[in-house]
């Protein structure tokens, strides 16, 4: 799996897939820079007048509901429909699902009406979308990854999608198969945007690998390794935020081989 992760990163840097992000205002700039440092090409476009045309150019689509409004929801549906028609991967980031009915209902409609490739969220978001009682603090999770594992498997089976829960340890499943990624650093939870960046990085990996379970696992491992490298000298959160971009840019095969911690299980 580590060798496959390294090959995916090489493909991203060689092919520079265009990742179309309909994402939130909070993370838009940081996400674009993270994709550039990874080796992909980002575009941030959410106007209903152009999202379908932009999807025609893209290699993957990210739908992030972090700063929702009615026009953005319309754009998300238009873009998702266009992406499905083109058979390009779609990654849904249900930011804050469970916190408000608007967020939860929007995420569920996207799941119900479109063939989402990967659903990437924190434990509280995944539990909420599975209809379980969960607690959120704004858009932050108060549940651990293991608490949401069964919910992730259920959602993966229902929607025929890959579901990825990110946290202290990441859990990725397509229902019958699953993987765990133990890479990362606590500083990743002390700055805004790392979860949203994770979704966009997963989309870039999905653009170059046909198996979304492998792609999501590889992408989350690379981001986690970058977090570990960025935290080597115990920086403060502000410095870490910038060092994470540098670590993505400097990522090499040897970093993946030396630091990657991926465990794969082929049956639940």
UniProtKB/Swiss-Prot annotation:
Keyword match Ligase: no
InterPro entries reported in the protein's UniProt record: Hyethyz_kinase (IPR000417), Ribokinase-like (IPR029056)
Enzymatic reactions: 5-(2-hydroxyethyl)-4-methylthiazole + ATP = 4-methyl-5-(2-phosphooxyethyl)-thiazole + ADP + H(+)
Annotated substrate binding sites: 44, 193
Superkingdom per UniProt: Bacteria
Its EC number(s): 2.7.1.50
Example GO biological process: thiamine biosynthetic process
Keyword flag Kinase: yes
Sites where the protein binds ATP: 120, 166
Cofactor: Mg(2+)
Any one GO molecular-function label of the UniProt entry: ATP binding
Keywords recorded for this protein, A-Z: ATP-binding, Kinase, Magnesium, Metal-binding, Nucleotide-binding, Thiamine biosynthesis, Transferase
Pfam family, one: HK
Annotated metabolic or biological route of this protein: Cofactor biosynthesis; thiamine diphosphate biosynthesis; 4-methyl-5-(2-phosphoethyl)-thiazole from 5-(2-hydroxyethyl)-4-methylthiazole: step 1/1
HAMAP family with a match to the protein in the record: Thz_kinase (MF_00228)
UniProt similarity note: Belongs to the Thz kinase family.
NCBIfam families xrefs: PRK09355.1 (NF006830), thiM (TIGR00694)
Function text: Catalyzes the phosphorylation of the hydroxyl group of 4-methyl-5-beta-hydroxyethylthiazole (THZ).
Protein name stated in the entry: Hydroxyethylthiazole kinase
């Amino acid at each position: 799996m580590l060798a496959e992760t390294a090959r995916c990163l090489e493909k991203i840097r060689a092919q520079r897939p265009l990742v179309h992000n309909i994402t939130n205002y909070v993370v838009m700039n940081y996400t674009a820079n993270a994709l550039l440092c990874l080796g992909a090409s980002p575009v941030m476009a959410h106007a209903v007048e152009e999202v379908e045309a932009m999807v025609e150019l893209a290699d993957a689509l990210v739908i992030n509901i972090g700063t929702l409004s009615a026009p953005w929801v319309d754009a998300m549906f238009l873009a998702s429909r266009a992406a499905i028609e083109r058979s390009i991967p779609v990654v849904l980031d249900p930011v804050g699902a469970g916190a408000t009915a608007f967020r939860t209902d929007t995420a569920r409609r996207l799941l119900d009406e479109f063939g989402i490739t990967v659903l990437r969220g924190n434990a509280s978001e995944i539990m909420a979308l599975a209809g379980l009682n969960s607690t959120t603090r704004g858009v932050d999770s108060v549940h651990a990854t293991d608490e949401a594992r069964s919910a992730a498997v259920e959602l993966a089976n229902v929607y025929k999608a890959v579901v990825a829960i990110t946290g202290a340890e990441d859990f990725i499943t397509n229902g019958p198969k699953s993987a765990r990624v133990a890479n990362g650093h606590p500083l990743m939870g002390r700055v805004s945007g790392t979860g949203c960046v994770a979704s966009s990085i997963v989309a870039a990996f999905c653009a170059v690998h046909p198996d979304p379970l492998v792609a999501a696992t590889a992408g989350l491992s690379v981001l986690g390794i970058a977090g570990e490298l960025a935290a080597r000298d115990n920086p403060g959160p502000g410095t870490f935020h910038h060092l994470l971009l540098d670590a993505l840019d400097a990522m090499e095969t040897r970093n993946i081989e030396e630091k990657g911690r991926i465990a794969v299980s082929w049956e639940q």
